């Protein structure tokens, strides 16, 4: 890694309060595939995509959450624990934790991801958080992961259990509409505009043909999530 990249790693380690024994692990975790591809085209051989770390991080987060929920909520049933774990391991929740530690500021992205607001995209932030969790796990074990991240996961787990926050908007909305109306929501793409690297999609959410909410986002998936979030707010107010 070069000096500029090394400085970013030092800043991030200070941010999360953990100093890596092997900083190369963190460097790998922060390298998006777009950045690795660009750097390899420039002749660099030390830059690898973080995709393998994402795979491991997903499993580490599952273990961290399962252990925490089992110990912290002894009265909770398997079904309740599974539901809470799914909510906290969702893309939306992981992206929020990534924002809590300002992860977007420290990521290494290719030019295309930079211009398309990759640093703010839920999917990219969630994947990057998984990679960083895996890097901490390899470097310092589960104890280090708990030290760095458990407080963030625990905070949101408690809020989900208490019903104070929703992360998986589409699933939550589906549960509401099935229980209340015995119907499933329908998502309809009604508009798509902008250049290929800066698309903006508009989705209408309908229930039994009736317009309930509209969502916009840089992808159809993000627009659907926003529509579901707005629909939940509206239905809770009814």
Swiss-Prot record:
Its cofactor is Mg(2+). It is found in: Cytoplasm. The keyword Nuclease applies. Its EC number is 3.1.26.3. The active site is at residues 58, 130. GO terms for cellular component: cytoplasm. PROSITE patterns: DS_RBD (PS50137), RNASE_3_1 (PS00517), RNASE_3_2 (PS50142). It comes from the Bacteria. The keyword Nuclease applies. Residues 9-141 form the RNase III domain. Homodimer. Digests double-stranded RNA. Involved in the processing of primary rRNA transcript to yield the immediate precursors to the large and small rRNAs (23S and 16S). Processes some mRNAs, and tRNAs when they are encoded in the rRNA operon. Processes pre-crRNA and tracrRNA of type II CRISPR loci if present in the organism. This is Ribonuclease 3. It comes from Pseudothermotoga lettingae (strain ATCC BAA-301 / DSM 14385 / NBRC 107922 / TMO). The gene is rnc.
């Amino acid at each position: 890694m070069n000096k500029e990249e090394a400085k970013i790693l030092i800043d991030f380690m200070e941010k999360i309060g953990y100093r890596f024994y092997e900083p190369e692990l963190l460097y790998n975790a922060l390298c998006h595939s777009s950045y690795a591809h660009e750097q390899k085209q420039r002749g660099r051989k030390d830059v690898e995509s973080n995709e393998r770390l994402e795979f491991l991080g997903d499993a580490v987060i599952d273990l961290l959450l399962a252990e925490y929920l089992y110990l912290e909520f002894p009265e909770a049933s398997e079904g309740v624990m599974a539901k809470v774990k799914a909510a906290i391991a969702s893309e939306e929740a992981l992206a929020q934790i990534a924002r809590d530690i300002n992860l977007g500021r420290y990521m290494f992205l290719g030019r295309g991801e930079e211009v398309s607001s990759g640093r703010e995209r839920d999917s990219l932030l969630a994947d990057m958080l998984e990679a960083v969790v895996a890097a901490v796990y390899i470097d310092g074990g589960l104890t280090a992961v708990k030290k760095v991240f458990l407080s963030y996961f625990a905070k949101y787990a408690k809020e989900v259990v208490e019903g104070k926050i929703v992360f998986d908007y589409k699933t939550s909305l589906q549960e509401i509409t099935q229980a209340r109306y015995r119907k499933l929501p329908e998502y309809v793409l009604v508009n798509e505009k902008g250049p290929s690297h800066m698309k903006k999609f508009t989705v209408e959410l309908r229930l039994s043909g009736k317009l309930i909410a509209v969502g916009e986002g840089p992808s159809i998936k993000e627009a659907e999530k926003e529509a579901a979030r707005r629909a939940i707010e509206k239905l809770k107010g009814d």
